[in-house]
Every structure is written in structure tokens, then in C-alpha cells.
Amino acid sequence: MNKKLFTQIKNEWRSNLWLITELLLVSVVLWYIVDYMYVQTSIYNEPRGFDISHCYLVQMGRLTDKSADFIPNQTDEEKRQDVKELLSRLQHRPDIEAAGLGQNSYPYNGSNSSASVVYDTLRSPGWTIRRLVSPDFVRVFRYRGTRGETPEQLAEMLKHPKNFLASDNLYKRRYGCDLTSLVDKQFYLFGDTTNTYNLAASLQVVRYGDYFEAWNSYCMVAPMPEEWYDLGTELCVRVKEDQDRDFIARLKADSEKLYRVGNVFIADVRSFTDIRRNFQQSHTNAWNSYLFGMGFLLLNIFLGLLGTFWFRTQQRRGEIALMKSLGGTDHSIFVRQLAEGLILLAVATIPAIFIDWNLANSELNAWMNGTTIE
């Protein structure tokens, strides 16, 4: 049977050549689709390096001179103390686990600042995110160190003004060096070569967002001077796990009585679940469009192949009837047809693998971890 099957395939080489070409194109397209979907899914599921569950952004406002409660002629120091006092009151609220201030620091934030982190001849990438924060900020989003440091331990480290934290992958791409090996070393920050800062801990990589790769996400975290405490900073809180229900409504209800400090008041409260959704809406829409488009393409490929083999079978009805008259069973005929299709697919797969490899080698497919071949 095998010999007859190969002879038949050879004799029908013209029609089989078209079928092999179709299978070749389908194989290449399917590989490209599967590769893209795998890469995007893998990136989305990478560890984020932070946790926004039970977290809220508290937006501050300041009374104007049109308000009867406005306090005029406040000094800059008094304004800073008002913000500091509001932070302290929130930290002591029973349903809040942690509260902290940051500048361009919270997750899913479109506003960024960058900083240089230099050790000897090692220099951080130009897009290293600078996060200036109060110590408890890392407790709010549960940052963790690569050597097992807890958020509480990291917060203690940030109480020293000369300590800082940074992503473990900061020098990995350029120099192949993990930052863990440089903990407790002295660094230059912010382009200042007259002062040194101590790397207190190396952080598990903090990603910029769910659709951004971990390997390309860099950040450094340093204590924010109290002189910078003002309305432009971001006040973030984490509530206890059983206190999420109606937290925003409860906090707003208490805000006028308990959280009006000087001219500073709570203007709005937003859940980080909403912030995350809004920040990533365009990425999510693009991802859904890709899913729909690729699903539609896969359906067309499936129907096209099904139609091709159905049409091929219809053309060979006479041949199938002859095989049955010569003693062939439905099972044996089905196995023969299936074997022929698998042989043609195997023939098409060989050049398809070659094409796929060259596409990847030419960096024309999806990237992950800085490469198209992993």
C-alpha cells in the first residue's frame, strides 16, 4: 500500500504541488500567528513587581480665597506641613494598611521622570524611571527585594536619605550584571558626581504596565525630600483586605471633618483598578482587535483547508468506489486518504520551518526579552 500511495502522489504531482504550496503558506501564517499570541500572552503574565489590589489614589486639593475657610498668607513650610499632616492622619486611619507619597511613581502612570544610576563604568539606560517616594510607598504597592526583603524592610531602608533601591535588571541588558551583586555599594545618582548613595536593596523588576516587558522595565526608587511634599505629589493608600467595600464613600464622608488640614482637602478618590483599566484601554482594545482578526483569519484558513480536501475527495469519488469494489473498507480508505494528507503536510513543513527560521532570524516576528528567537 505504501508503495502504491507514493506512486500515486508522484503521478498526481501537479495537483499535489498546488496543495503543498497552500499548506506551506498556511503553515507559515499559522506559525506567525501562534508566535505573536504566545509572546503577547507571556508578556502579560510576567510578574509585575507590584500589587494594586486594595489600593487607591487620593487626589488633594487646596481651598481658594473664595472659600470662607481659606487661610491666607500661608508659608511654603506651612503648606508642606499640611500635606504631611494629611498623610499622617490617613496612615492612622483604622481601615488603611499603608499610605505613602510619590512623584510620578504610582503604577499605570503616564507621567514619568528619569534618572541616571552610575556605578564605576556602569551606567543605567536613559529610560530608567525615577520614583521619588515617602518610605511607606513601597508598602502600599508591596515592592519586594531580590534577596527576600519584605515591603516593610524596604520601607525602613528608605527612611535613610542616602539609601535608594533599583531594579535588579538595571545593568543586565548592557553589561550582563545583576544589581543584586552590587547591594551596599556606593552609586552616583541624578548626574551628581559629588554625592554618593547607597544601594540598600535590589528590587524585583517593577514593570511599567501589563503590556510592557519586564526585561525592558527599569526604575530606581529614592526617598523624596519633605521639601517636595505638596499638592503635586501622589497620595496612595492600601486598605486592609476586608475594608474595600464602600471605602471611597466612607473616606469622602469623613474627609471634611477629619481630613481637612489647613487649606488642603481630599478632592477625589480613585481605585487603582479603574486607573489600570483607563491607562491600558488602548492596549486592551488593540489586543482585542488582534484576537478578533486572528480568530477570523484562523477560521478562514480552517474552512479553506476543509474545502480544499472536501473538493479533492469529491473529485476522487470514482477512485474511492473502485477501491471499495476491490475489497477496500471505509476504514482502510480513510487511513489512505489521511496518510496522503499527512505526507503532503510533512513535505510542506520542511520549507515552512526554513522560512519561519529566517523570518525569526531577520527579526520580522514578535520580540520578547530582546530577541525574536528564544
Predicted regions and their residues:
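Short juxtamembrane loops and helix-capping segments at transmembrane helix boundaries
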Residues: 43-50, 355-374
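Hydrophobic secondary-structure segments that place a key small or acidic residue at a functional site
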Residues: 123-217
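A short amphipathic helical element positioned immediately N-terminal to and/or at the very start
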Residues: 1-12, 86
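Hydrophobic alpha-helical transmembrane segments of multi-pass inner-membrane transport and secretion
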Residues: 13-39, 282-318, 345-352
